[in-house]
Amino acid sequence: MSQQVIIFDTTLRDGEQALQASLSVKEKLQIALALERMGVDIMEVGFPVSSPGDFESVRTIAQQVKNSRVCALARCVDKDIDVAAEALRIAEAFRIHVFLATSTLHIESKLKRSFDDVLAMAVHSVKRARNYTDDVEFSCEDAGRTPIDNLCRVVEAAITAGATTINIPDTVGYTTPYQFGGIITDLYERVPNIDKAIISVHCHDDLGMSVANSITAVQAGARQVEGTINGLGERAGNCSLEEVIMAIKVRHEMLGVHTNINHQEIYRTSQLVSKICNMPIPGNKAIVGSNAFAHSSGIHQDGVLKNRENYEIMTPESIGLKEVQLNLTSRSGRAAVKHRMEEMGYQDKDYNLDSLYDAFLKLADKKGQVFDYDLEALAFINKQQEEPEYYRLDYFSVQSGSSVMATASVKLVCGEEIKSEAATGNGPVDAVYQAINRITDYPIELVKYQLSAKGQGKDALGQVDIVVDHKGRRFHGVGLATDIVESSAKALVHVLNNIWRAHQVEKEKQRLQQNNQEMV
């Protein structure tokens, strides 16, 4: 029977340290409840002595969260421990996590103490924390650079004092998997009372090895892994919990352990953390990145369509995503194009695959990714691989300031005529969008707005990528200009042209259907 690896989440403590602005109590509670749904065993939610705001956050979460154990951090200082206990006492059960540097470098240059002093401080603090709870974790800060003899001594002393979890952090991400696994093995072999506590690991990603170090530690006997959602954390970040969790699930036959995580909540939790923390997830991020389950190569797409296991070691559904994503690009094959048309409900008799694929390749070479509405337009109304511009931005002006509501005037070329409108909004971009929407009158909802810089200095361009929802369907648009408001307006106009084209497709399909009925 496999053993459980306890998942200890520190997104709201160690992860928050990476953010430019502190999270509100409400935002922290949102994340805590999401972590609870996901099934984390322990959540470290703050450092109560650090500020009144952190104290209030810890107390609020301790009151609201019922199915995960709430934990707070404290230095090996009496006041820290007492304040942590006060913040947590409203919870039915809680953990106090005390930490103290143990490496020679930290002891001499930071603490300016002797190792014997550190040993005594660790024992005293663990005992003090045990006065409040029987769940006490002790962390040997910078354990990765602590001499193994000293590490064994402090671990043994902390367990004797009452620590039920011993955490071995690679605080600066210095160790390699072979080295870190060796540290855990040495502890099991040399600490006589090691069986009285759970060994935990907390790895940072400075050399990009936090997940590998954590998995190696599990193989060596560690039974708790600490980390954050999306790898949030200081410097290069923490061990990415979703990666460790899925590695344990996917490689269960090798690791022989399991977690109690609800895997289908992983993606939703990741997206929530990204949104609240304003930390975008890189597209190539393992498990939760937008490309993690995307296939662009024609060979890969064909292989996935024949058997998903050809190129997928886990399913998107296993983390809460709905389906495989086949990105249609110039590298896509005929099978992928045909599959996408079938998914949209078209049969072979509805279009000519040869001519569609030829037109698709030419369009993909020009624009990169081709979307569903592009395919339909190529199949039914536009064989020239050009995106027709029914709408074109002719002119816009904006007035805004700190004490006035933003107002925009817009002129839009609509086919053969020019229409103009004015509107107010919550900022200049919103005002321009409101004015354009008054002209076109399409029911749309902005789903995504992303601004990125192209180039540097005064010649830099602002690229705006947006996604809107129109009658349950997603449409994409891109705008590029030196002025952010202008690039935003161009992106929306691009979207509107895509929507207009989709409407033309529907009209053409209706016309063809009517002609077929008349022929019958």
From Swiss-Prot:
Domain of life of the native organism: Bacteria
Catalytic activity: 3-methyl-2-oxobutanoate + acetyl-CoA + H2O = (2S)-2-isopropylmalate + CoA + H(+)
Residues binding Mn(2+): D14, H202, H204, N238
Main localisation: cytoplasm
Residue ranges annotated for the Pyruvate carboxyltransferase domain, each copy included: 5-267
One GO biological process term: L-leucine biosynthetic process
GO cellular component, one term: cytosol
Disulfide bonds: none
Entry cofactors: Mn(2+)
EC numbers: 2.3.3.13
Residue span of region Regulatory domain: 392-520
Pathways involved: Amino-acid biosynthesis; L-leucine biosynthesis; L-leucine from 3-methyl-2-oxobutanoate: step 1/4
UniProt-annotated location(s): Cytoplasm
GO MF term set: 2-isopropylmalate synthase activity; acetyl-CoA C-acetyltransferase activity; manganese ion binding
Enzyme class: transferase
Entries under InterPro entries matching the protein: 2-IPM_HCS-like (IPR050073), 2-isopropylmalate_synth_dimer (IPR013709), AIPM/Hcit_synth_CS (IPR002034), Aldolase_TIM (IPR013785), LeuA/HCS_post-cat (IPR054691), LeuA_allosteric_dom_sf (IPR036230), LeuA_bact_synth (IPR005671), PYR_CT (IPR000891)
Keywords: Amino-acid biosynthesis, Branched-chain amino acid biosynthesis, Cytoplasm, Leucine biosynthesis, Manganese, Metal-binding, Transferase
Similarity annotation: Belongs to the alpha-IPM synthase/homocitrate synthase family. LeuA type 1 subfamily.
Protein's job: Catalyzes the condensation of the acetyl group of acetyl-CoA with 3-methyl-2-oxobutanoate (2-ketoisovalerate) to form 3-carboxy-3-hydroxy-4-methylpentanoate (2-isopropylmalate).
Subunit: Homodimer.
Name under which the protein is recorded: 2-isopropylmalate synthase
Species for this entry: Yersinia pestis
